[in-house]
Amino acid sequence: MFASYKSIQETCAFEKLSELAQSPYDLTQPGALQADNRLQRYQVAGQAFKLFYATEQVDDRVLAGLQAVADECQLVSQYRAMRTGAVMNKIDGFVSENRRVLHTATRDLFSGEPAEASMNSRAKRELEKLSHFLDALDAGEIVNEAGEAFTTIVQVGIGGSDLGPRAVYEALKSYTIVGRRAAFISNVDPDDVSMALADLDLGKTIFNIVSKSGSTLETVTNEAFVRRALLENGYDSARHCISITGEGSPMDDPDSYLASFYLYDCIGGRYSTTSMVGCVLLGFTLGFEQVMAFLRGAANMDNSADEVDILKNIPLLMALIGIWNRNFLDLSSLAIIPYSQALYRFPAHLQQCDMESNGKSVDRQGRAVQGKTGPIIWGETGSNSQHAFFQHIYQGTSPVPIEFIGFSESQRGKDIEVQGCTSQQKLLANLFAQMVALACGKKDQNLNKFFAGNRPSCLLFAKKLTPYVMGSLLACYEAKIVFQGFAWNINSFDQEGVQLGKELAKRFLREIGGEEEGFHGIESAFLNEVQRGV
């Protein structure tokens, strides 16, 4: 199936781009950012956002080469195939998951002709279930043992069941229904769980247990922790727990859960935020109307990613500029810096989504990849990050590309003017200053004050962070990650490295529990040595 698709190294444009990378656009030359209307020309508008990329080390020749890469690798054609239900999660000729990839179907709800009908109808059915469930909560039909309303929902899950929903909830916390909140339990660390439980009014709390298989080790363990706490405090856990799981899994049990919502094999955990994995939590805290706005934003960004012209397609252009930085300029990491405190958990979500997707060394035909794949993803909010690690970004020996995210208006609309400008104006001034300073640098005979410049960055900019805009932002990055995986000709939808760690953890647990008496492998030797004298 994938033999007809090229990786970037197999394209005709690869050699030309490699030549251009020997002398990339010099952002430090006088007037570099203003030459040829660069600031005006190097921007793309789409779905509430503008992408400004004049501060990247690209020029028209590079952009033409990247367009050729997109065309030769059939990036948009592969994206369309994914959206319409092609089996994209596979490795040709080798044992693999062999699944469709349909996270986009969970929000393809707003046109008469969805890209893929069967998964779309399931998504609509789950949303209808959620709407009825939320209505019953609001009407007082679902209450606790004392007849009181639930005020808190706790998401119990790990990986994609935690990071994406947590990032979006924190981003949209300003829109929460008065009197409702969310909390999260993810780590199997007992201290984390017990501290989370200590901060709750258990009687007014619903626990949302998320596991597609119904057997995820950390989640099953934490669910037992939660149920014990409920029992010890005199509560019926079946009246306080709901599940999001695969249909027919051990967690699809009406006797043990207040309600169950379904998650399907064609939706990977890191891409599941617009499924019930995120929507149940967001529906409880924000309300169903805001959930639909969030999904609409994601759906519209999905549709805009269907454009073949890279200068009209924000996620595709971001993906290709990222490939330019990674494969041609040999930049090994990428910092995500949102100038919005509401997005403080978003870099962690993107870290998982990107690195678990594209941290691969085998292509889709089971061969070793020919070049570099996904960069290391990290980040923090601005302007805090300026006072944490920007020293390294400015003057370190390893240049770090940055994707900035910003908004012209604050989310809550409360501000103060000090020294002639508002806090939001100060925030934006700092954002814009970083982009210009990183690009242009500063000459100084004192080398300790010398800034080399040519540190590439771009900016995703919108008016205000709303549920619609958050959905659009999430889908933008999902599409970007998928496009890059297609360009590298890797499977962005499995995580075999994670599976190996899980298998070995189970072997250690059997050794700790004495289930393999007489077995003396590396597990036994490792445990004996590490724990000796502790």
Swiss-Prot record:
GO terms for cellular component: cytosol. Pfam families: PGI. GO terms for molecular function: carbohydrate derivative binding; glucose-6-phosphate isomerase activity; monosaccharide binding. Pathway: Carbohydrate biosynthesis; gluconeogenesis; Carbohydrate degradation; glycolysis; D-glyceraldehyde 3-phosphate and glycerone phosphate from D-glucose: step 2/4. The keyword Isomerase applies. CDD domains: SIS_PGI_1, SIS_PGI_2. Its main location: cytoplasm. The active site is at residues 356, 387, 502. It is found in: Cytoplasm. Its EC number is 5.3.1.9. It comes from the Bacteria. The keyword Chaperone does not apply. It catalyses: alpha-D-glucose 6-phosphate = beta-D-fructose 6-phosphate. Keywords: Cytoplasm, Gluconeogenesis, Glycolysis, Isomerase. One of its GO terms (biological process) is glucose 6-phosphate metabolic process. Catalyzes the reversible isomerization of glucose-6-phosphate to fructose-6-phosphate. Belongs to the GPI family. This is Glucose-6-phosphate isomerase. The gene is pgi.
